[in-house]
Amino acid sequence: NYSNPQKGLPLLHSSVQVFDASKGNMVATLDGESVTAIRTGAVSGLATGMLAKKDAKVGAVFGTGVQAKSQVEAILAARNLEKILVFSRTKKSAELFCNVIYDTFSIKASIGDKDSLKEADVICTATPSKKPLFAHGDLSMGVHINAIGSFKPYMQEIPVETIINSKVIVDKIESCKVEAGDLIIPIKEGKWSFDMVHGELGQVILGEVSGRDSDGEITLFKSVGNAIQDLALANIIMKKMNNDRS
């Protein structure tokens, strides 16, 4: 329900059920929103570490929900940022989120605008938007973008021009072909193709494809989520729970 965030509720309600592989019985039910936020943030942090400029100083986040907070945590873990710019549909939600960022991470946070977006070295988009959140001309060269909000073919956070002019890395190419509106829409307009994807994040990590080649190129990580990430996180949680009990 798209009105849920205004009510202080998650956009989507979900749960993750964990089963014992040897016995077949359910051993835990995890909050799906928390699992999604943690694993999505972790992957964005990894992508930022592999693709953002080493001297990145300014981060920007579009959105003020649980996912946005995990994105901020992730990029702060990956780079020594000095401030975060917050972009939201309302001034009130942006101000509140700036306070959350400062109180949680002890880093300066301020409301962003079109002009200040050019300062950003790392941008995270975490919204259910159906139209681009910014214009390509608002970006600086060398920026890295984590686009994680759109997960349906009709959703779009990133301008077509930005997709065309970026080195695009994805979490899973087959999933993006079905769900990544940020990539599907440019294809429908005849301006891009999946053959132009530089590679998957795993390939960058393994050294099979290059990451950032220069401080001047724009890199974009598109993630729609991957079930193996949920499994990996659930496994970590269960191991920690079992260790805490012993």
For each feature predicted by the language model, list its residue ranges:
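NAD(P)-binding Rossmann-fold cofactor-contacting core
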Residues: A77-Y102
